[in-house]
Amino acid sequence: RDCLLSRGLGDVYKRQVHLFNAMPAFTHREPGVVGAVSDSEHVMAEIICDGVHIHPSMVRAAFKMMGANRMIFISDSMRATGLEDGEYTLGGQPVVVKGNLATLHDGTIAGSATNLMDCLRYVVKKAGISLETAVMCATENPAKEIGIYDKVGSISVGKQADFVLIDDELNIKRVYIDGKEIIC
């Protein structure tokens, strides 16, 4: 079954979302979706790096299996991100947000309340991914994947200048949109 899944990815599938989440476990006898994705060199893997969805060792394992050029960091962030803990809705369902975690009333993870900058901090500080690699996975890789790397995803002449300046502790010091500093 998994062998068929792996062969079946072919050139049809280009991206896998929420690696390790809502899918069977990756095992040596039945590698499932994770095995199929790691076996398919043309498939990009989106991974939620919020500190809730995936343990730091699994983030490192994904990098070892797939390589940094195939990884895309996502936040799985919902609209309550940055707001106080409390009750909100997500897709018409009531969810409880506490810290960076959003759950249904039965405790099932419903999403994240973490922004992408916090995800980047997490993979650098907790999973041990280099800052350069983490930035690439949060900017360059997704821009290439959706076909807009000629406009965004890196700081280059002729590209839209959207970027943040951070200090050594990964705190945001300045934000630029279209080359103009904005006040946060």
How would you name each of these model-derived features?
Residues 15-19, 44-46:
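Short beta-strands and strand-loop turn motifs
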Residues 29-47, 51, 58, 63-75, ...:
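His/Asp/Glu-enriched, well-ordered alpha-helical/loop segment
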Residues 1, 20-25, 77-79:
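Short, acidic/turn-prone active-site loops that include or flank metal/cofactor-
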Residues 2-13:
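Single conserved hydrophobic/aromatic residue that forms the stacking wall/gate
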Residues 170-176:
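Short, Lys/Arg- and Gly-enriched loop/turn segments at beta-strand edges
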